[in-house]
Structure formats: structure tokens, C-alpha cells
Amino acid sequence: MSETLTPSAGAANNVVGRVTQVRGPVVDVQFEGDLPFILNALHVQNGDHTLVLEVAQEIGERQVRCIAMDTTDGLVRGTEVRDTGKQIMVPVGPATLGRILNVVGEPIDERGPISSELRFPIHRPAPSFEEQAAASEILVTGIKVVDLLCPYLKGGKIGLFGGAGVGKTVIIQELINNIAKAHGGVSVFAGVGERTREGNDLYFEMQDAGVIKIAEDGSTEGSKVALVYGQMNEPPGARSRVALTGLSLAEYFRDEEGQDVLFFVDNIFRFTQAGSEVSALLGRIPSAVGYQPTLATEMGALQERITSTKKGSITSVQAVYVPADDLTDPAPAATFAHLDATTVLNRSIAEMGIYPAVDPLDSTSRSLDPKIVGEEHYQVARQVQQTLQTYKGLQDIIAILGMDELSEDDKKIVGRARRIQRFLSQPFHVAEVFTGAPGKLVSLEDTIRSFKAVVAGEYDHLPEGAFYMVGDIDEAIAKAEKMKQEA
């Protein structure tokens, strides 16, 4: 590809400017000659490290306004700035596997430089219509509620929506555990504006799981995941670009090696939030709820690159923070339009102690179609949702009049729905250290078989507690037996 450059190609040209103003992460630079292009990377020496600036605006004939990719502490007016003549270029390829990179592609895992001659720009065009390929193969996650009610597609875009503390990151980590370990290809994880502690935990968990392999000599050969971090403490410039850096890494494996890539993003809302901060600093007039006026454009530019082509695929799982649990907020609303499957986490379900706290009636998937999942799966999923919806409709009557006022049929439906609700819970491998309960991975066949029997009323005689935090129906039966003996 013409844009795959070696470090020596397109070396820094001689266009030199000087810093005229520093306002937090926004830096104004004056040039005497030609101005650098928009999105060009500029280098400025700040103490003992090179600070990367990205050109965002031209202000007047001689000045450009830039966004800093790292802290500007210590930067003074008059400092010399060099135009690199190209965008921010990041190393790509097998050498990035097992490593942690920052937004500009520098290693931050203290394991020495990345020995890759291949580099990609972080801003790249989306694949054309001719290059794209439709996906219709189901990606089995081993999580019952997901596989049954909002199944994921290989090569699809998946969103995990939820407010603060309802379990988005835990589900992402469980998906990495269940899918990435069994996945033949490579994975890329972009940590966008989230907690540094979580990034640290994930790195060591991946080593324990064997997805990242570090030899005694420090080599990471045999690793299957690359990590790109721009965490909460980073300036908004880094947080608004780190998802693009991760995506460039994933695109290399898709386009150049023809691989099926898993791309995890935690959290896509922070990408929007950082864009909002940058927009305000650049003096743009804000739009609804204070977000940037270019919200839909920026989201589209990112999401349209995440797609399957005839060469390979990118399956993306994106956590989406929902401010104040309001799904109509412009940031989550802008993300909805791009997704193939949405898994919505509900605080009221989490408060009942049912984890994963997935809302079975709010979560949707384009692939819950008899042509894709098959007639049996489709019918079982719809019957489960119908039972839960009927129960939801009866809850007001139960709250006012009590269970005794219901008809016998309604009482059966309520009992069945409560069993289904509890059966949708599942112990996770990544939560094992906190709960002490071993994680369960349930096959799609077992999930369909189990729910088909429960929704048909075959297990109405078992106590509700037997369905809580188990794998398939056989475990629920065994738990019921144990409860009977202990009673």
C-alpha cells in the first residue's frame, strides 16, 4: 500500500515554526514560510521528550492552532517546532503484538523500542463499497443472555451500553477471556479515557491467560493482542485520537495479512467526551448538551473504518458509557446508529443482583433473524422476551393488589418469568477472584435447549433460587437437588 511507510521515508522536512501561545493542550505555532497541512504532526522538544502536536486549524496567514498529544507543562513561547510533513504515523504489524503503545505509537511498557519498519497514519479512509463484505456468521460468546437474545455477528459492530458501575468493563474482559483466547487471529484493545488501574489489570490478566507471551529474553513472540492506551489522566488530544491509533493497528492485520481481527474499545464515550473538550478549546460553538457540533461526523469517520472487507474482518466490541443512565444523550445516541448489536445494561437489574445486568427487552441485534440464527433459536428467544414482557406488564397489578389477585395462568407466567430472569444470570471467569464462584461458559446449543425447556414450563417445579448464577439447565437441576437436601 502506498501509505505503508518506513521511518526513513518522508523524513521531517525543513519547515520550522515557533510556539506563540500555550493554552493547556492547545498550542498556537507561527511559521514564516508555508503552513503545514491540517492533521499534520508537528514535533517540538519539551524538556527531555519530543511532544507531538496535531494541526487542527489555520488562524490567519502565518499561524496554526494545534492539539497536543501529551502534557504541555514546561512548554514556553518561542520554542522551535518542526513540521514532519505527514500525519501522526504509528508502528503496525506483528512487532506490536504483546506490547502497550500510546497514542503516537511509542511503547509505554518499558520493554524497549518496537522493531517495526511498517507505519500507518492514524487518519485513513474507510474501505470503499466494492471492498466491503457482509457478515452473517454468529460469534458465540458463551454468555447465555447475549447468545440467546442479542447474538453477535463475526465482523459486526457491538455496543455495550450502561451507566457508571453496572458492569461494562467486566463484560468486555469476559468477552476477551471467552473469545480472544479461542480466537485464531489477533486482537487489538484500545483503552480510551478509562482507569489506568483497569489497563494494568488487563495487561497482567492477558499474560496469565497466555494471550500475551513474554519470554525470558523479553521478546513477545507468540502474543495475539496489541494494547493501545490513552487513559483518564491523558490530555484530551490523546484521548480523542487513541481509538484511531488502535484502529490503524487492526486495519493492518485485516488489510495486509487478511486476518479476522477482534477490536475492543473501552470506552467509546470518552472518545466523544475528549472531542467535546478539544472542540471547546478550539473555540467552536457547542451544540446540544454542550457537545461538539461535529459529533456525528467524528463518530462516522471512526465507525465506518470498522468493517469487514473481502480480505478480512474487524469484529468490534465497544463499551459505551451512558451519562446519567440517559440513552437519549447525544453521545450514546450517535453511537447507536452504527451498531449491529446493542447490549444494554440496566441498573435496576444490577440492583436485583443479576449479573451480567443485561436488559433482555432493551437489547437488540440485527442477527436475531431466522435466516441467520435458525428458526428454533429465533422462536425460543422471542418466547423468552414475550414471557418477560408479560411479567413486566403484570408488575403494576402485583404491586397494588398482590399475587393472589392474578389468574392461575398469570401466576404461572410470573413464576416462569422470575425463573428466566434468574437463569439469565451467569458467573464470569474474570469475576471469580471476587465472588469465589467458578466462571461458566455455556455453548449456544445448551443455551437454546435450556431456555426452550424453561419457557415451556418443564421446570416450573424447581425453586427460583436454583436458576440463579448457574450455567446450563443441568446445573440448575443439580443445584435444586442440593437445596432440597440442605432444607
Swiss-Prot record:
SUPFAM superfamilies linked:
C-terminal domain of alpha and beta subunits of F1 ATP synthase, N-terminal domain of alpha and beta subunits of F1 ATP synthase, P-loop containing nucleoside triphosphate hydrolases
> What PROSITE patterns does the entry give?
ATPASE_ALPHA_BETA
Give an example GO molecular function: proton-transporting ATP synthase activity, rotational mechanism
Matches recorded under InterPro entries: AAA+_ATPase (IPR003593), ATP-synt_VA_C (IPR055190), ATP_synth_F1_bsu (IPR005722), ATPase_a/bsu_AS (IPR020003), ATPase_alpha/beta_chains (IPR050053), ATPase_F1/V1/A1_a/bsu_N (IPR004100), ATPase_F1/V1/A1_a/bsu_N_sf (IPR036121), ATPase_F1/V1/A1_a/bsu_nucl-bd (IPR000194)
**Which reaction is the catalytic activity of this chain?**
ATP + H2O + 4 H(+)(in) = ADP + phosphate + 5 H(+)(out)
Classification via CDD domains? ATP-synt_F1_beta_C, ATP-synt_F1_beta_N, F1-ATPase_beta_CD
EC number(s) for this protein? Answer: 7.1.2.2
Q: Name one GO cellular component term.
A: proton-transporting ATP synthase complex
Localization = Cell inner membrane
**Pfam family for this entry, one:** ATP-synt_VA_C
Entry keyword Ion transport: yes
Residues the record lists as binding ATP: 162-169
This protein's membrane topology, according to the annotation, is: Peripheral membrane protein
Alphabetic keyword roster: ATP synthesis, ATP-binding, Cell inner membrane, Cell membrane, CF(1), Hydrogen ion transport, Ion transport, Membrane, Nucleotide-binding, Translocase, Transport
Where is the major localization of this protein?
membrane
Q: What is known about what this protein does?
A: Produces ATP from ADP in the presence of a proton gradient across the membrane. The catalytic sites are hosted primarily by the beta subunits.
On subunit structure and binding partners, the annotation says: F-type ATPases have 2 components, CF(1) - the catalytic core - and CF(0) - the membrane proton channel. CF(1) has five subunits: alpha(3), beta(3), gamma(1), delta(1), epsilon(1). CF(0) has three main subunits: a(1), b(2) and c(9-12). The alpha and beta chains form an alternating ring which encloses part of the gamma chain. CF(1) is attached to CF(0) by a central stalk formed by the gamma and epsilon chains, while a peripheral stalk is formed by the delta and b chains.
Extract the PANTHER family matched here: ATP SYNTHASE, ATP SYNTHASE SUBUNIT BETA, MITOCHONDRIAL
Q: Which family does it belong to?
A: Belongs to the ATPase alpha/beta chains family.
Q: Which HAMAP family match?
A: ATP_synth_beta_bact
UniProt-recorded name of the protein: ATP synthase subunit beta 1
Origin organism is Gluconobacter oxydans (strain 621H) (Gluconobacter suboxydans)
